[in-house]
Structure formats: structure tokens, C-alpha cells
């Protein structure tokens, strides 16, 4: 019999952390973060990282594990998450995976086809080609090879364009083809929940209020500290995180403070929309929870889990 795991998914600002804390007070669970922004040290305000008080109530694994100069893949996450899940299960507890990075959940459930290691010669050739023709031209080339990846990648995102083309040149297969090849399935029985306000206008308001709150808490100073390091740039996954990119561009002088706030809020709302689109198209059953009814949401999880474990 496989051990049990709980997935608590949802868009940004939906109340996942609050519910996770409530569940930890009632269930023998340990929390694993499923968030591609919370992995970075020194990025606390703009990622809405759980506070010290919240972490005292519900410690989160897989947060603050990398410097912002480092990259982290879905495969890295799968390896790390499986290790943490095994540790939690060995303690007789249930892994509670909480977050909104849907690609990480997908990788965990379905496994991943191993991607080739970087080839410095191919990368150098692509960078030389980009210097002559521009990254937009390479993005056009990618669109012919792998239209699905090209649609997801911004024409100015040199790092991701380079990687997608590099994978094709090494393997002869597109990144989309390779990522659709299944790897090892998750060795757990898992129950999936998604939390969001039933009224989407509430989510939009929460996102706007939270972004303004981040500004009040010192988000600009947090990014200024990263900006001053000198070894970070806007093409790194950490700086491309929602909010950080907009603040970074503001610090570069690309637009004024008011425009930065507007763009940051818009980008966060777009992220929430993408997350909800992922969830609506999810292949396996999800129990939806209304974050405007937190007590009811908690009771639904407890009731559902109890009936699930009884079979």
C-alpha cells in the first residue's frame, strides 16, 4: 500500500498558507513548499514568504534553499520533494505539499523525461547567432521547431530560448516532446485540493492590496539590495519572478514608480489566471475549496481525508 500525501494547490494570494497552518494543528502533517519563488534566500517580501510566526506554527521545507544567482528546475524540485516526502513518511507523518507552481506538481505526479546536460559549444554558437541576428530571430526559429514552447517563452527571454534550442540541437527532439515523455510515476496515493475565492473579483482585490502592502513593508529596499550585488540580472529565474521583474525594471529607469506598481499588480493577476487555467485543465480529480470560507475549507479537507483513508 502506498503512503498518503496531500496536495494543497491554488493561485497566488488565495489563502494556501493560512489553511496549511490550520491543517497542521489538526493533522499529523509536515509542510513542503511547492513554489518556484520561495526557494530563494533574501527574497521574502515580494514572494509573500510565510512570516517567522507562520513558520513557527508550520515549518515549510524547500524554502530558502538557493541563492538568487542559482537556477532550479522541475526535475530538481521532484528529486528534493521526493526526498523530503520520504523523510516525513518515515516519521509516520503525512506530507502536505502547498504552493502554486503547477509545473512542479505535474513533474512530481507524472515524472519527467531526463533532459540533456548543457552543451557549452552549442550555447556559444547560439549566443553568437543571437549577437548577429537578435534573440527575436532565434525565437522565430524556435517557433518553427517547437511552437508550444515558443508560445510560452517571451521573445526577449534569452536564457529560455537558448535552452529550448540547445535541447533540440542535442537530441533532435523539441523540449515539448521530451517533457511529454513520462518518467517515473509518484510512489504515493495523493489527495488533491485547490483553494481560491469563488468570486474572482475578490482574488483581484487581494492581489492589489497585497502588492501595496509589500511596498509598505520595504519591497523596494529588498530588490535594491539584490540589484546592488552586481552579479544578478533580469534574465535569471529569480529576478523574473512576478513583482521582482517590475521592480528591477523600475530601478533600471525603465518606468516610474506608479507604472511599476501597476505592472506588478497586472503581472500578478496574470500569474493567478495562468494558475487557475492549469487547475481547471488538471487531469486528476481536485476537490475545490472556497478561501472565503476558511473554517468550511478546513472541515472539507479533514472530512475528505478521513473518508479517503477509510477507503
From Swiss-Prot:
Residues 35-38, 159-163, 240-245 are annotated as: Interaction with substrate tRNA. The keyword Ribosomal protein does not apply. ATP binds at residues 10-17. The record marks 101, 123 as: Interaction with substrate tRNA. Its EC number is 2.5.1.75. GO terms for molecular function: ATP binding; tRNA dimethylallyltransferase activity. It is an enzyme of class 2 (transferase). InterPro entries: Dimethylallyltransferase (IPR039657), IPT (IPR018022), P-loop_NTPase (IPR027417). Signal peptide: none annotated. Keywords: ATP-binding, Magnesium, Nucleotide-binding, Transferase, tRNA processing. Substrate binds at residues 12-17. The keyword tRNA processing applies. It catalyses: adenosine(37) in tRNA + dimethylallyl diphosphate = N(6)-dimethylallyladenosine(37) in tRNA + diphosphate. SUPFAM superfamilies: P-loop containing nucleoside triphosphate hydrolases. GO terms for biological process: tRNA modification. Monomer. Catalyzes the transfer of a dimethylallyl group onto the adenine at position 37 in tRNAs that read codons beginning with uridine, leading to the formation of N6-(dimethylallyl)adenosine (i(6)A). Belongs to the IPP transferase family. This is tRNA dimethylallyltransferase. It comes from Haemophilus influenzae (strain 86-028NP).
Amino acid at each position: 500500500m502506498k503512503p498518503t500525501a496531500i496536495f494543497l494547490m491554488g493561485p497566488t494570494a488565495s489563502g494556501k498558507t493560512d489553511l496549511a497552518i490550520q491543517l497542521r494543528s489538526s493533522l499529523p502533517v509536515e509542510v513542503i513548499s511547492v513554489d518556484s519563488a520561495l526557494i530563494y534566500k533574501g527574497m521574502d517580501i515580494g514572494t509573500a514568504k510565510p512570516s517567522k510566526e507562520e513558520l513557527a506554527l508550520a515549518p515549510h521545507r524547500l524554502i530558502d534553499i538557493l541563492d538568487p544567482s542559482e537556477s532550479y528546475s522541475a526535475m530538481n524540485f521532484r528529486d528534493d520533494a521526493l526526498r523530503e516526502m520520504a523523510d516525513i513518511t518515515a516519521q509516520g507523518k503525512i506530507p502536505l505539499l502547498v504552493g502554486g507552481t503547477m509545473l512542479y506538481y505535474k513533474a512530481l505526479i507524472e515524472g519527467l523525461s531526463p533532459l540533456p546536460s548543457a552543451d557549452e559549444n552549442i550555447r556559444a554558437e547560439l549566443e553568437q547567432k543571437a549577437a548577429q541576428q537578435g534573440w527575436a530571430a532565434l525565437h522565430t526559429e524556435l517557433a518553427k521547431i517547437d511552437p508550444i514552447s515558443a508560445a510560452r517563452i517571451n521573445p526577449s527571454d534569452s536564457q529560455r530560448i537558448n535552452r529550448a534550442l540547445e535541447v533540440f540541437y542535442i537530441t533532435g527532439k523539441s523540449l515539448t516532446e521530451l517533457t511529454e515523455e513520462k518518467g517515473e510515476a509518484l510512489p504515493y496515493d495523493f489527495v488533491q485540493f485547490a483553494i481560491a475565492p469563488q468570486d474572482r473579483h475578490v482574488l483581484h482585490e487581494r492581489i492589489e492590496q497585497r502588492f501595496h502592502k509589500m511596498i509598505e513593508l520595504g519591497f523596494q529596499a529588498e530588490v535594491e539590495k539584490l540589484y546592488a550585488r552586481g552579479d544578478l540580472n533580469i534574465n535569471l529565474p529569480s529576478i523574473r519572478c512576478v513583482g521582482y521583474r517590475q521592480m528591477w525594471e523600475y530601478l533600471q529607469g525603465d518606468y516610474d514608480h506608479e507604472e511599476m506598481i501597476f505592472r506588478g499588480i497586472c503581472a500578478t493577476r496574470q500569474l493567478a489566471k495562468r494558475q487557475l487555467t492549469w487547475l481547471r485543465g488538471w487531469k486528476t480529480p481536485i476537490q475545490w475549496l472556497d478561501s472565503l470560507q476558511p473554517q468550511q475549507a478546513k472541515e472539507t479537507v479533514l472530512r475528505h481525508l478521513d473518508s479517503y483513508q477509510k477507503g
